[in-house]
Amino acid sequence: MKKMLAVTLAVLMAGIVAGCGTKTESSAAAETETAAVKSEASDTEQAQESQEPSASGDPIRIGLTTVLTGDRSLEGEYASNAAKIITEEINTQGGVLGRPIEIVIEDALGTDVGAVNAYRKLASDDSIVAIVGPDSSNDGMAQSPSALEFKILTTAQGSSPTLKNMCNNDNPYLFQLRACDDTLCAALIKYSVEELGIKSYAVMHDTETSSADQARLFTEALKSYGIEPVVTVPFTTGTKDFSSHIAQVQASGADAIIGAAFQTEAAILIQQIRSLGIEAPILGSNGFADPVTIQLAGELNDNVYCASAWVPNTPNPKGAALAEKYKELYGDDCGKAAAQIYDHISLICEAITLAGSTDREAVREAMNTIGDYQGAITKYDCRTNGDCGRGGLLVKVVKGKAEIISEITSEKVIE
């Protein structure tokens, strides 16, 4: 079921402020729902008007496609929460071009078809200035032709090299804001061979496109060390019983297991491997250290290594501030999907500011002038082409807690 959530400023502010124990009232300057907002620091303190400039006028509307229903609906929950946080921050600081922003959310349903339908509904609305795509390379690639058709700036959350190629060569309206899997997978294999001393590997991967791509990249990185996987075991999205797959891995005698899958399947896979008493290191694609995976797998998520875009205990000050605010408002650790949405909306607003306009083409052109932009996750540089994300984190998960080993950087040369 597709859902349309036209998120107005008043709704966003009510949700955010209620979450942190404050209350809001409309300013005397305007009586509409998009009025500037006063805040009270606490019930025992005298209310003071914000000294920030107020946003007024018609809202600047930004579309967001995310998964609100189905097995991946936790992603949509994180995304929606982050949209509220960044909207409240921007609007209380004067908005963009002096106007408030409004995030319009469509349910991508967790399928390629759902992602395209959600995207086209937003793109066909002339009031939408730019669109944030869902947390999947597959969905981003499926949306790419529509982005080109409607000529609207679209940010993709996926990390596939195939998506990267689309952004750099095929579609000037599509921007990949995560460090690419080719960088992340190579970094994880390098660490496992050179630091952990692992000699033999089994590969288990989902057959959907992005996970299969990650498995291929892991395998290519192993080959650069003269290592071939002792066994490769594919499975399909939605698999709940991995016993036969794990049996193949056990029979192979591999020292470590490489896994490539989305968060739900990753969590089930980890649970079942550890429940069988297998203690071998698991080297996972970026979702294996995500709070969604950790929440689902719990303490069984142990001795798991991952090259990830994000963990809540990030050393990045801007990311740490977001993680703290998210925890305060929602009681949960800030997931990758939330951090990505926060950065995507921030970058789009930066492009609108640089353009000095809400014209779609002007905003897209302005996006290509952004360089060295510090987000919550990493720095972004969009000046030469459409892949903008520059870094990640090498992480070890110990009994459900992500510990950062080192930062991963992917420098971009500006000519």
PLM regions: where:
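Segments of small-molecule ligand-sensing domains
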Residues: 328-338, 349-404
